């Protein structure tokens, strides 16, 4: 059996479905994320600039290779509509085949 592989899963939230889908699509098309999953709406409760807030947000999980992580982050920040977006990642274990797929450069990157 092959060794377990490793990938990064980056999680963020967006103020609406359109922004979530746009970022997910663009980051995958640029080859910076191998897969992005836009999840349904959640309700966020938070303090921002001294005020209590409640907002509907959309969660997106991006699958990113360790090699692409810094480039992904720069593009993510460029595309995200929030001044201070939620951005956290986990290094996770994945099946060997899935990790290989996430970590293999896209075909159009070599052209």
Language model regions located:
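Positively charged, small/polar-rich N-terminal and surface patches that mediate targeting and assembly
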Residues: 1-111
């Amino acid at each position: 059996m092959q060794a377990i592989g490793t990938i990064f899963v980056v999680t963020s939230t967006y103020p609406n479905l359109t922004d979530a889908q746009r970022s997910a699509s663009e980051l995958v098309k640029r080859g910076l994320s191998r897969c992005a999953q836009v999840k349904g709406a959640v309700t966020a409760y938070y303090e921002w600039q001294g005020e209590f807030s409640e907002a509907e947000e959309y969660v997106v999980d991006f699958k990113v290779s360790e090699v692409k992580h810094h480039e992904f982050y720069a593009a993510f920040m460029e595309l995200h509509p929030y001044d201070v977006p939620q951005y956290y990642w986990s290094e996770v274990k994945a099946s060997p085949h899935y990790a290989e797929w996430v970590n293999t450069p896209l075909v159009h990157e070599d052209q």
